[in-house]
């Protein structure tokens, strides 16, 4: 009898290990990239290089999708089955009064037959029907434009302290430290020790329990009204203008997607990545920005002028530069190296009119090394 009990215990432990080792393989993850159209409702904002409504400039539609696409790519690599509400930009609900000539109705499919859904109740109904293992809605937030306010907030369906889809608070608490890990964002408040995690009714100033949708689920945010434990992530404030300029860099948005991936992967006990990342920002050592569309937090690193068009070289221990990154012209100074093997490296920075600079960096597996550095101008002797 004791022998049989031992065998049963071994079988149970083996099953437990198998389930824990499974990670994301076979999991169904639903990813909603918030917004979808090129309308005035899709958070267009002016930047130094782009007027408002310029699709090459800032639209939350665009930046949300960049984040979501990277997240979904990583999830699929890990064996998850991924459902996206949309995979393209420029889709609106039927009858959208603010639709532009660039927008199409959401029921249209792309060239691969992927239906594009942006109607929030339709998304909620699809999520409830699929009943995935995980749901996330990706957004960025807004305050008064030019305000220094910038923080991360995760919202779940319900009242603060009372999640209507049980398990949502747990998922928010687990995910928050991973998503928050980005010093470039220059957070003004909220941290892993004091996270902004809230019920959507409470945060949005609604009245509990909120209006029910066609499925009978109550709450405030339409996209969360389904049975799946979930949250909506306001990843940062695009009304904080330096952050808005960073969001014009697709690689910067991709790295937010990586942080979402790390949170979800860890939640399901997935294996950590074997490589790491280097993410940084390159600024002038002395010149302070002076532009009405670049209001920065007092005494922050954001006050300094980003260096456009610089070359950043990744140099190995042999002194060989084996990768390079060209900072864009969008006034952010962002540079990114992904899929970097763990080890010690040197970053070499070169830009016209500046002294060459080097920085040492250590890359760890499944981690991001952040580098915020400045370059000194060459002083003319004339």
Features from the language model and the residues they span:
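Short, acidic Ser/Thr/Gly-rich low-complexity loop/linker segments typical of extracellular
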Residues: 305-308, 315-334
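Active-site-adjacent mobile loop/cap segments within catalytic or ligand-binding domains
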Residues: 27-30, 41-44, 137-145, 155-156, ...
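Extracellular beta-sheet/turn segments enriched in Thr/Pro/Gly and aliphatic residues
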Residues: 357, 362-382
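A short, solvent-exposed beta-strand micro-motif common in secreted/extracellular proteins
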Residues: 343-353
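A short, amphipathic beta-strand motif
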Residues: 276-284, 373
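Hydrophobic core positions of the immunoglobulin-like beta-sandwich fold
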Residues: 336-338
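Solvent-exposed loop/turn segments at secondary-structure junctions
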Residues: 35-39, 58, 82, 88-92, ...
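Active-site histidine-acidic residue metal-binding/catalytic motifs
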Residues: 20-124, 148
């Amino acid at each position: 009898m004791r022998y049989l009990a031992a065998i049963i215990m071994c079988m149970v432990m083996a099953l437990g290990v198998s389930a824990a080792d499974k990670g994301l393989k076979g999991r169904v993850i639903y990813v909603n990239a918030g917004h979808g159209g090129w309308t005035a409702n899709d958070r267009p904002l002016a930047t130094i290089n782009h007027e408002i409504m310029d699709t090459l400039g800032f639209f939350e539609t665009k930046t949300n999708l960049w984040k979501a696409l990277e997240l979904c790519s990583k999830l699929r690599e890990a064996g998850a089955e991924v459902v996206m509400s949309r995979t393209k930009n420029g889709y609106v609900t039927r009858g959208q009064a603010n639709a532009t000539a660039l927008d199409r109705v959401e029921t249209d499919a792309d060239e691969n037959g992927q239906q594009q859904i942006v109607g929030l109740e339709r998304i909620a109904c699809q999520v409830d029907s699929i009943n995935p293992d995980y749901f996330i809605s990706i957004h960025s937030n807004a305050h008064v434009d030019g305000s220094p306010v910038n923080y991360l907030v995760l919202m779940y369906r319900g009242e603060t302290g009372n999640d209507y889809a049980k398990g949502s608070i747990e998922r928010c608490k687990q995910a928050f430290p991973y998503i928050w890990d980005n010093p470039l964002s220059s957070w003004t408040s909220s941290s892993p020790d004091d996270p902004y995690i809230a019920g959507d009714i409470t945060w949005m100033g609604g009245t509990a329990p909120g209006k029910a949708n066609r499925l009978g689920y109550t709450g405030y945010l339409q996209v969360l009204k389904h049975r799946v434990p979930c949250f909506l992530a306001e990843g940062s404030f695009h009304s904080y203008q330096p952050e808005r300029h960073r969001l014009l860099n697709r690689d910067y948005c991709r790295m937010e997607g990586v942080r979402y991936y790390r949170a979800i992967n860890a939640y399901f006990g997935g294996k950590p990545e074997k490589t790491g990342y280097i993410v940084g920002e390159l600024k002038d050592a002395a010149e302070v920005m002076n532009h009405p569309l670049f209001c920065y937090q007092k005494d922050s690193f954001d006050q300094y002028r980003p260096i456009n068009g610089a070359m950043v070289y990744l140099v190995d221990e042999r002194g060989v530069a084996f990768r390079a990154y060209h900072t864009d012209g969008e006034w952010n100074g962002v540079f990114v190296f992904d899929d970097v093997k763990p080890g010690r490296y040197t970053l070499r920075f070169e830009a016209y009119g500046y002294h060459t600079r080097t920085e040492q960096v250590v890359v760890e597996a499944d981690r991001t090394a952040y580098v915020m550095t400045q370059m000194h101008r060459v002083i003319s002797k004339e």
